[in-house]
Amino acid sequence: MPDFPKEHATPMSNRPPAHQARKRFGQNFLRDTGVIDRIVRVIAPRSDQRLIEIGPGQGALTEPLLDAVGALEVIELDRDLIPGLRVQFFNYPDFVIHEGDALQFDFAALAAEGETPGKPLRVIGNLPYNISTPLIFHLLTARGAIADMHFMLQREVVERLAATPGSAAWGRLSVMTQYHCRVDNLFVVPAEAFTPRPKVESAIVRLIPHDEPPHVAHDEALFGDIVREAFGQRRKTLRNNLKTRLDDTAWAALDIDPGRRPQTLSVEELVRIANHVAETAP
């Protein structure tokens, strides 16, 4: 795991310094206390769990989570926010700050260390819109170390995560996430709940990694490649997008019409395609 600086809060005044949201970090700070309370209720944190918050910002979720469980680790990239967090939560001895980029963070290594090694992580965050998709793919690689994830994301991204085959939102993100996790689209958060106010609505999503995928790909790396290739050109047919992988004989054996478009395929069908390619590879 990268050597992220790790620090506990230190005693100072508990009044954090002012901070302006930064566009390059995609920062929009949650302000609505009603929304904050509702998020904490759906997370339902317990003191025997290990909670990790990505991008605590100015601590809108951090404070009620700490009040609920007494211990919390956060990952923050913006160095200008860290002094304020350290000040604000100095009286919580089990508040730990990891300074660094969540996209580079080794969540599996984190779960394997500490006072309770091996205890799965509960990951929480109001994720910046500009990194939400790559961060979810990164977290999926550590799914074995994660109990669940609760994120606030752009509403459109949540709709893609929770989409069904045949819908306009169904795509690579939907398939790969639903292969690995149960997805619950919980509720919408209006733009006015944030400062500065974003141009789009947000939503809360829950991701729970499967103990075993409902449909098992024999080679998950190959499955990921097949999904990426299948959705590479959404308006093209499967025959076109997967022409280097399957011929008409293979499509007939799979009982899948190669004239279909990728957004009509279910996770189960894509797994069957990947498994057929794996089984018939020279």
Curated annotation (Swiss-Prot):
Its main location: cytoplasm. Its EC number is 2.1.1.182. Gene3D superfamilies: Ribosomal RNA adenine dimethylase-like, domain 2 (1.10.8.100), Vaccinia Virus protein VP39 (3.40.50.150). Belongs to the class I-like SAM-binding methyltransferase superfamily. rRNA adenine N(6)-methyltransferase family. RsmA subfamily. InterPro entries: KsgA/Erm (IPR001737), rRNA_Ade_diMease-like_C (IPR023165), rRNA_Ade_Mease_Trfase_CS (IPR020596), rRNA_Ade_methylase_Trfase_N (IPR020598), rRNA_adenine_dimethylase (IPR011530), SAM-dependent_MTases_sf (IPR029063). Specifically dimethylates two adjacent adenosines (A1518 and A1519) in the loop of a conserved hairpin near the 3'-end of 16S rRNA in the 30S particle. May play a critical role in biogenesis of 30S subunits. It catalyses: adenosine(1518)/adenosine(1519) in 16S rRNA + 4 S-adenosyl-L-methionine = N(6)-dimethyladenosine(1518)/N(6)-dimethyladenosine(1519) in 16S rRNA + 4 S-adenosyl-L-homocysteine + 4 H(+). PANTHER family: DIMETHYLADENOSINE TRANSFERASE (PTHR11727), DIMETHYLADENOSINE TRANSFERASE-RELATED (PTHR11727:SF7). This is Ribosomal RNA small subunit methyltransferase A. It is found in: Cytoplasm. GO terms for cellular component: cytosol. It comes from the Bacteria. It holds the Pfam family RrnaAD. Residues 1-21 are annotated as: Disordered. The gene is rsmA. One of its GO terms (molecular function) is 16S rRNA (adenine(1518)-N(6)/adenine(1519)-N(6))-dimethyltransferase activity. S-adenosyl-L-methionine binds at residues 28, 30, 55, 76, 101, 126. Keywords: Cytoplasm, Methyltransferase, RNA-binding, rRNA processing, S-adenosyl-L-methionine, Transferase.
